Amino acid sequence: MKTQALKGMRDLLPAEQTLRDYIQGKILETYRASGFERISTPMLEDMENLDKSDGGDNLNLIFKVLKRGDKLTAALNTGDPKQLSDMGLRYDLTLPLSRYYAANKDKLPSPFKVIQTDRVFRAERPQKGRLREFVQCDIDILGDSSPNAEVELIDVTTRALLNIGFTGFTVNINDRRILRGMLESMGFAADTLDSVCITFDKMDKIGAEGVKAELTEKQLPEAAIQALADFIAAGEVTLDAVAARCADPAIADDLKYVLATANAMAAGRYQVAYCPSLVRGQGYYTGMVFEITCPQFSGAVAGGGRYDNMVGKFLGTQVPAVGFSIGFERVCGILMEQGYQIPGAKQKIVLLYTKDADFPAVLAKAASLRDSYNVTVLPQGKKLGKQLGQLEAAGFVGAAFMDKDEIKIFAQQ
């Protein structure tokens, strides 16, 4: 039997789990204080829903579940790989939320302000900050089409990060509609814009030449590709310059409002920036998109945007929706690398007792010590020195004994 967790998935030791519990608790506390309510959805979703979710490259990373019994046999006989699976693990929390809202909308307030903190799964190539099983902390607003929804999500998400001591970050904001308008004016066909946007989103990773090469590989019009390359080469891409190529000035006005308002809310505690190349990889985004970046990590530590068409796939009528997700694993990893300590956390000690001790008295003494410490009750080992060394290595700061009033504090403390 293999003892190691599967590649891209992790076992968590008690010290890390304790820290994660605290961080998640502070995030939830911030979300709830702002009027958001938590829900849960199943980890498995219907493959038809997953396939039609416009999830971009994530659709290639779905963990699929094979059909069972006679259904699997029948599927194998078709020779069609797509017939083999009828369900899969969710790759994010947006599709499940959209299905949930469509099924329960008559029982929910409008606008619906919702929290989801849960595990998602992607068949990634594991690397630092990129796992196959990971936690997302999402907040979404469904039923509000105004840019105030974006402003509120940015405000609540940044306050959650600040409340856990995560600082020095930048909120990057863009609007897909402005970018799409500019690209269409350059000669890209409307039905290719999603593909062009996804390539343009890689600007920071592959550079202008890489973007040009990838668009050329997609056999898009040379004149349009060159127009985009010339625009990038011209220097700083300002919002006004991009907006001038967009047919609807109201879209640019909304983006300017969100940028200005978010910057005012930041009050110097973090940065807010217009990022013209920001697209987000998921195809379901329809308007504004945002990401949070920081110097300690090469990718985004949080991201989201508006997805006004997703719920409509289930209902047949459009429901405005926008969400923001904190990449919990990445944020926790950065904080742990910085030596993060839980503020005001009680230190933990052990109360050791011998086999002839009165156990109710042991529990009573442990209770009397818990005003000052977190106390674990353990039987005393035959080799006390070795036992104390193991306890110290496990993070205990000291040991108490039934026959002594004082607490033995370990040397490193």
Question: Each predicted region: which residue ranges?
Answer:
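Short Asp/Glu-rich motifs
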Residues: L50-D51, R180, K202, Q387
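Positively charged, Gly/Ser-enriched RNA/tRNA-binding surfaces
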Residues: L19-F36, E45-D46, P81-L84, D92-D106, ...
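Short glycine/threonine-rich loop-to-helix capping motif typified by GTGT followed
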Residues: D54, R180-A190, G283-F290, E337
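Glycine-rich, mobile lid/loop segments that gate access to catalytic sites or pores
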Residues: T170-G181
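Charged, compositionally biased N-terminal leader segments and the immediate start
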Residues: M1-Q4, L183, F188, S195
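Acidic, His- and aromatic-enriched active-site or binding-groove loops in soluble protein domains
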Residues: N58-A74, G187-V211
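Short, structured secondary-structure boundary patches
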Residues: D51-L66, A190-D194, I292-P295, F396-M402
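TRNA-binding/sensing appendages of the translation machinery
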Residues: M1-Y91, L95, A103, V151, ...
